[in-house]
Amino acid sequence: MAQQYQPGQRWISDSEAELGLGTVLAQDGRLLTVLYPATGETRQYALRNAPLTRVRFSPGDSITHFEGWKMTVQQVDDVDGLMVYHGLNAQNEAVTLPETQLSNFIQFRLASDRLFAGQIDPLAWFSLRYHTLEHTSRQLQSALWGLGGVRAQPIAHQLHIAREVADRIAPRVLLADEVGLGKTIEAGLVIHRQLLSGRANRVLILVPENLQHQWLVEMRRRFNLQVALFDEERFIESDATNPFEDTQLALVALEWLVDDEKAQDALFAAGWDLMVVDEAHHLVWHEDKVSPEYSLVEQLAEVIPGVLLLTATPEQLGQDSHFARLRLLDPNRFHDLAAFRAESENYRPVAEAVQELLDKGRLSPAAHKTIHGFLGNEGEALLTAVNDGDTEASARLVRELLDRHGTGRVLFRNTRAAVQGFPERKLHPYPLPCPDEYLELPLGEHAELYPEVSFQAQPDASEEERWWKFDPRVEWLIDQLKMLKRTKVLVICAHAETAMDLEDALRVRSGIPATVFHEGMNILERDRAAAYFADEEFGAQVLICSEIGSEGRNFQFAHHLVLFDLPSHPDLLEQRIGRLDRIGQKHIIELHVPYLETSPQERLFQWYHEALNAFLNTCPTGNALQHQFGPRLLPLLEEADDGEWQALIDEARTERERLEAELHTGRDRLLELNSGGAGEGEALVEAILEQDDQFALPIYMETLFDAFGIDSEDHSENALILKPSEKMLDASFPLGDDEGVTITYDRNQALSREDMQFITWEHPMVQGGMDLVLSGSMGNTAVALIKNKALKPGTVLLELLYVSEVVAPRSLQLGRYLPPAALRCLLDANGNDLSSRVAFETLNDQLESVPRASANKFIQAQRDQLTPRINAGEDKVTPRHAERVAEARRRLAADTDEELARLTALQAVNPTVRDSELDALRKQREQGLAMLDKAALRLEAIRVLVAG
């Protein structure tokens, strides 16, 4: 053994290939010292079993001098144990290169190089690489890519909007669903799908300051998007020249940005592909004056290609405000308010005619005349068929009208009336006597709405004299929880102090298991509290939340909600109820409202219930009514005679009923049909649920965990604990936490246990693990023994995996047309390709591992025979590669031509189709076809099989 090592020889580490070429420094007794100049690392190995492979190049190989020039080897000499290579450089001149002068940065990543360098991987890794290629290809071609990985129940209208918008180049749309229909999820799906497809790389999210945390939680928990929250402190403390350039997704409060010109300059300079603006209806615009917030968003919309505006419904906004949002998206199309009003008025009769067709299945003469006037003579045949009772013609007519809808491509608005699946609400009021201690409190802002806060804030308040010892709502709550026994109950109150005090009260006075959730806790602490509440067996019966602390959380596995106090605005009340009242809630929402009699609490309850009807139904008019009656409401809460109070209630109720009638009359059923997807969303839901039921992902991930040295153990039903083992292969594996994580593949489990990672094909752990496999050399060589009686012992089969590789920007999405699926070739001794007759899994079941040392000896002995067979493999698969590229070109051309034809025809009748959109699509087609023409065949992996 000792004689095989000579100072100056080049060896490569079998376990640390990333170190580059090593140089033998010394052999001292039983130790061997090797320097790796590329990294400056030195390693000492036991002489008997050093994990090293001798680097030997052969004639035909291309090698690199440490100064950077290359040569093609023609002859190799062994001079005193050192290799000397002779050959030709790039200028075709004869050169000599001793191995001591080889580049230190050579790494054997090509399959053939690694095979002959003795870097042979475990058999399981080869299978892992093959399956990674197959799964990657399938996902890139899937219509669900970017839609199925969200931690939420798949809902038809959300999926339809997400696919429709995210598949556009630089989408510019208004998302105006009614409250509770999931605009934030729709926006997150669009962001996620655009990022995965490469259509967007940098995203800016502008939100009101009070919604920053909610967005942060939603994007991280639901979509695994690592959003950077920017505020003044972070901006000032950053060492970067432009702090915004360091992040892919920035979450910024609009209030701060408007007041900080330096931050504005940095934001404009950073460059963005997509901008999302929440609560866009708060951007004030009038023909003669605009707010600073509106002006800033308008300037950003001029330079950022994609824009998503999340806003209240057009009916709530009013026509002028609605126009203001649309002109942010397309100022050329929406430039004249008067013209927009006229166009909207002209379109209203058409929407009413469609309503008639949908409700009655036929058209009256007046409706027929209206639609004929809108479509012209080209619609006559369709109208005749509709009148003859042709249901297919009715559907076609609706589609024709949808295409011509003035804002149908830029505005998406779903309503609760059109979307089914919401639960019923049941109200349980509990009037309780107001204690004397509260009657003596000084008046202050909302003091009598939240008397416990005022009581505890008194200078002379003592620890012994806690408010929860005399407040009847606490005794009532304890009794209510005992009656409900193990039923999960969510309690929401306005202030964090109240929430923490209530937890103390329940612990001291009842022993009922409770946990608290407030804005003073970090995300990890909130996750633990939410998980404790969600645990059916050992968890808390009650979760007590503050107003702010519960933002962005979903507790719909519970259906009992206690409103310990009432918020000062109807929108906040709707947000509270919305924690449970969501699509997919399977139970009636039981609303428990305790309040103190003859106090402002009682009057606020009456205001919400009798005037706004805000407990039993959503209240789209709440904001308008609060704005209209707020100045009169607040003084009357504290002191007014009953007659004056009742007059206000009656007046507000009448105004609400009038506004609701207006909203109903103004409903645009055609727009609702377009926003709902007319059945397309339902098909996506079905496909996602079917994908959820498959076992391919858990099976694949187990092999991935085994390969990378990740230990997995059962946590509970449908859940696993992952931890790095001592043999962890790569510390960069995206486990998410060095200490370990808990995961589930079950969507329902993930919805109730936010402390668990929801693993789907889109999860960063899955995508990152697959990238580690394919971006490196892992599993691209293997040697195995094949047990098959039909093969003569000693027969050598060669299995080669190729991929059709196209180097192109991700935004072109060429992976959809030419995915990296393996082109497999199985060569026998006579050069015949057996791959079509012997499937991969069939072959895999017949294989046994070979010790690495034995495998290496065999490969070195067979090198001269294997090299020409490897070269012959490319000739075998080249025709299949050419067919695959031709099919990719055909599909790309067909898809883009079809979309161009559709949009061109649409543009003729609907000016919201922008010229820039058509130009971008034509450019994408041209670039895509040009890139596909350059697609090359690459050898991905080699497996040598020896019959035994």
Curated annotation (Swiss-Prot):
CDD domains: DEXDc_RapA, SF2_C_SNF. SMART domains: DEXDc, HELICc. GO terms for molecular function: ATP binding; DNA binding; helicase activity; hydrolase activity, acting on acid anhydrides. A motif (DEAH box) lies at residues 278-281. ATP binds at residues 177-184. GO terms for biological process: regulation of DNA-templated transcription. Keywords: Activator, ATP-binding, DNA-binding, Helicase, Hydrolase, Nucleotide-binding, Transcription, Transcription regulation. The keyword 4Fe-4S does not apply. SUPFAM superfamilies: P-loop containing nucleoside triphosphate hydrolases (SSF52540). InterPro entries: Helicase_ATP-bd, Helicase_C-like, Helicase_RapA, P-loop_NTPase, RapA_C, SNF2-like_sf, SNF2/RAD54-like_C, SNF2_N. Its EC number is 3.6.4.-. Pfam families: Helicase_C, RapA_C, SNF2-rel_dom, Tudor_1_RapA, Tudor_RapA. Residues 164-332 form the Helicase ATP-binding domain. Residues 473-627 form the Helicase C-terminal domain. Transcription regulator that activates transcription by stimulating RNA polymerase (RNAP) recycling in case of stress conditions such as supercoiled DNA or high salt concentrations. Probably acts by releasing the RNAP, when it is trapped or immobilized on tightly supercoiled DNA. Does not activate transcription on linear DNA. Probably not involved in DNA repair. Belongs to the SNF2/RAD54 helicase family. RapA subfamily. Interacts with the RNAP. Has a higher affinity for the core RNAP than for the holoenzyme. Its ATPase activity is stimulated by binding to RNAP. This is RNA polymerase-associated protein RapA.
